[in-house]
């Protein structure tokens, strides 16, 4: 890869800005100042700007703790979106949420610009689980447990894949639900089959990766390569 292209992708700048940095001697390759944008980099080369090492990222993967009232979209004319919460941190990346949470729901949203990865975690063929803590307005029953395990048939006739539901609170109104498919308003509609309403829904994990407990609502951070791998493991 050319050095100027590498700079544009890793330092989040334009080719023109990269050219200026090079001309001013701010860029080092393997510890030596380099001013030539057409320099071809090898995989083993290290690049720094003003002495700070850069890390090449073909794609970006972010964990965001979605607060209530924010919509799971890239853009929206009326409401704040999950991408809005990232601000201008990645001006040259076209981030989008891999999957959605309802406006009133909270928890783990994965933001990325990797369309192939997003497809993999959303496709029912890959069986990537999503784990939720759900508050319902009536205690969990054995009928619900049995129905979820067998696969609920929704009111419109849609037959769902088996899901897991377990009680978390003594009164049976706080439960954990694990899904391996995604249907519009799925959890609310599943409980609705049994006459139960959903008061709150919080996504705790995607695949084998749990939401970072240190992230307050609205906060986000990058995922490491190891964390990304946990999602589909």
What annotation goes with each model-predicted range?
Residues 1-233:
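Basic, flexible Lys/Arg- and Gly-enriched helix-loop patches that mediate nucleic-acid binding at interfaces
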């Amino acid at each position: 890869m050319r050095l100027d292209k590498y700079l544009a992708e890793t330092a989040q700048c334009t080719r023109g800005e990269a050219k200026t940095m090079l001309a001013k001697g701010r860029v080092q390759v393997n510890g030596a100042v380099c001013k030539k944008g057409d320099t071809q980099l090898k995989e083993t080369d290290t690049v720094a700007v003003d002495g700070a090492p850069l890390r090449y990222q073909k794609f970006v993967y972010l964990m965001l703790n979605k607060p209530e009232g924010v919509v799971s979209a890239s853009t929206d004319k009326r409401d704040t979106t999950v991408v809005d919460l990232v601000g201008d941190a990645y001006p040259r990346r076209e981030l989008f949420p891999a999957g959605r949470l309802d406006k009133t729901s909270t928890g783990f949203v994965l933001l990325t610009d990797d369309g192939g990865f997003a497809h993999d975690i959303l496709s029912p063929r890959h069986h990537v689980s999503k784990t939720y803590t759900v508050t319902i307005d009536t205690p969990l029953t054995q009928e619900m447990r049995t129905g979820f395990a067998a696969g609920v048939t929704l009111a419109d006739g849609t037959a769902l894949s088996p899901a897991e539901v377990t009680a978390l609170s003594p009164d049976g109104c706080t439960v954990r639900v694990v899904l391996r498919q995604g249907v519009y308003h799925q959890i609310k509609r599943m409980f609705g089959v049994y006459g139960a309403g959903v008061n709150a829904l919080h996504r705790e994990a995607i695949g084998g990766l749990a939401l970072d407990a240190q992230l307050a609502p609205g906060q986000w951070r990058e995922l490491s390569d190891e964390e990304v791998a946990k999602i589909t493991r």
